[in-house]
Amino acid sequence: MSTSSETRAPGRAEARAPEETRAPAPVRGTRLALHAADLGRPDAVALTGVDLDVAPGEILTVVGPSGCGKSTLLRTLAGLLPPLAGGITQDGEPLTGPSAERALVFQEDALLPWRTLRANVELPLAIRGLPRAERRMQAEAWLSRVGLAEYTRQLPHRVSGGQRQRAQLARALAGRPRAVLMDEPFGALDAQTRAGMQDLLVKVLRGTGATVVFVTHDVDEALFLGDRVALLGSGRLTAVRDVPRPRDRAVHDDPARTALRRDVLTSLGS
């Protein structure tokens, strides 16, 4: 269960760690596209006629009511669920199954409970065949980037829900994916921790070069995180909107942003 505040190590400031660690070289973000695609299962079609182009390196947020097909869309982009009709491509080539180039991050942290945070982050590095010393160094660097430098030897149950999600993000990015697919990863967190994770996500992901598709039911989260926001409803992709920038929590009365928020809520029937 998530806790409402982050666990602190005595006498140390967790927040300074990301700035002290040099970022790894960025990857080349991938282009993901759906072409007139029907998504779901033969006995339960979730979305029909989806045309969507996710540009390399962008953050696309996907918002819609519960049961509208958001998770189905994400699993299709991950290669876990083939389209029922139409096509799906990665960089113009057919996408035919799961790949280490596309990392999934879920609401439940999915960390292995018997492994320390560092050992969890080392998993994709071990799959890549890196030597033990290199795995340890890279895992510690990623944990530092997400503010967990003081918690590398902790087991998942000894840290807060927000910290477990930070570790899950570090594990996903340690594998150097070209796309990160996120299924409501902050949905179980309290409001303060959630806002901190959103800020951290933008900061860390912008340094990776990866393409991001982020599913949420929260319109404000979608507008804060996304370069564009895709709207789902009534079994289809209803619209894709550009999000005005700069990204700033302090700006509440920007006319373009206010109009977009109103448009999104109207489109979703809220």
Residue ranges with predicted function:
Residues V63-P65:
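The feature captures the beta-strand-to-loop junction immediately N-terminal to the Walker
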Residues V180-D183:
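Catalytic Walker B motif of ABC-type/P-loop ATPase nucleotide-binding domains
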Residues A126, A133-Y151, K203:
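Conserved ABC ATPase "signature" region
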Residues R115-L123:
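Short coil-to-helix segment of the ABC ATPase nucleotide-binding domain corresponding to the Q-loop/switch region
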Residues L169:
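Hydrophobic anchor residue at the start of the ABC signature
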Residues Q154-H157, G175:
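Conserved signature/switch motifs of ABC ATPase nucleotide-binding domains
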Residues G86-P98, Q138:
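Conserved ABC transporter NBD signature motif
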Residues A78:
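Helix-to-loop junction immediately C-terminal to a conserved catalytic motif
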